[in-house]
Amino acid sequence: RAGTKTAYSFGDSEKKLNDYAWFIDNADFKYQKIGKKKPNPWGLHDMHGNVAEWTMDIFSKEGYDPKSLDNPWSKGRDLYPRVARGGSWNDFPDSLRSTARLPSAKSWKQQDPQLPKSIWYLTDAQWLGFRIVRPLKVPSAEMMESIWNTGVTHDTLE
């Protein structure tokens, strides 16, 4: 949310959305080169629209635990559904709101030719990507272990 409490990082009105996001009204039915729209207050581009970002969060209809809203992470061991955020070039403005979340689906990867299926092969979700991030401070070994060794298993041949 880039430190904001509004619907979008630039305010509550959709009127400025064209300045900050690629979405169904302006993207010409495809993702666009990054960095062409205005950044959020933290200087990050394309946080609304263009491609939705697949996160490590487990999807829950209830949302995040109110006790962990400072730095929320809904950790889980299941591969599906995870959370996609930010909306995409193929979405309407409501899906680009800072709080909007979309549950992932196994069908996003159905054309993956690899066995076992890759957790990152997404030819059926061309509106989805991920953002590489790093913390400002190197996490402890215990924290790294909890992040990268979640116990999630790969897809099976179902």
Residue spans of the language-model regions?
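C-type cytochrome heme c attachment motif
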Residues: 19-21, 50
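Short, small/polar residue-rich loop motifs at catalytic or cofactor-binding pockets
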Residues: 37-40
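Short, surface-exposed glycine/acidic/tryptophan-bearing loops
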Residues: 14-18
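Catalytic cores of peptidoglycan-degrading enzymes
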Residues: 33-35
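His/acidic/aromatic-lined binding-pocket segments of jelly-roll/cupin-type domains
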Residues: 42-45
